[in-house]
């Protein structure tokens, strides 16, 4: 029975954390959703490490619900895969620090291409946060 008690406790903790996010939603979130909905190209989601795992899930969820989307690994991007990004795409980039080297190396090319960037980062005033047209902490 202790396993069941622990499982319930874990689910209660996770549910409370999700509910706490409700109060953190603001206009930036609405702007990001609007940008994705209006996207004429694809939604490209990118991030390294644990953020990359979350990005893969975001891309898979978008694709499975009818939004053309895919995950682009930042290390692969800087070694030739940046050519897949077009100006009518929307890029969502995630990095807790906002300074992940592989990801920050992609940002200059994104700027040149003109694809709008939604930055998801905990790093206020970071390279990623500064580069995003929509910044969600």
Language model segments and positions:
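Glycine-rich phosphate-binding loops that contact phosphosugars or nucleotide phosphates
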Residues: 41-137
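An N-terminal, well-structured beta->alpha segment
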Residues: 1-41
């Amino acid at each position: 029975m202790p396993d069941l008690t622990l499982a319930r406790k874990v689910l209660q903790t996770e549910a409370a954390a999700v509910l706490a996010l409700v109060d953190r939603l603001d206009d930036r979130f609405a702007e990001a959703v609007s940008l994705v909905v209006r996207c004429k190209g694809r939604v490209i989601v990118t991030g390294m490490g644990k953020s990359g795992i979350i990005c893969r899930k975001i891309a898979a969820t978008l694709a499975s619900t009818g939004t053309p989307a895919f995950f682009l690994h930042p290390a692969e991007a800087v070694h030739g895969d940046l050519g897949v990004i077009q100006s009518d795409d929307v890029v969502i980039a995630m990095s807790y620090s906002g300074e992940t080297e592989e990801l920050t190396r992609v940002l200059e090319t994104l700027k040149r291409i003109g694809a709008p960037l939604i930055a998801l980062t905990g790093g206020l005033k970071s390279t990623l946060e500064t580069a995003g047209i929509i910044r969600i902490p």
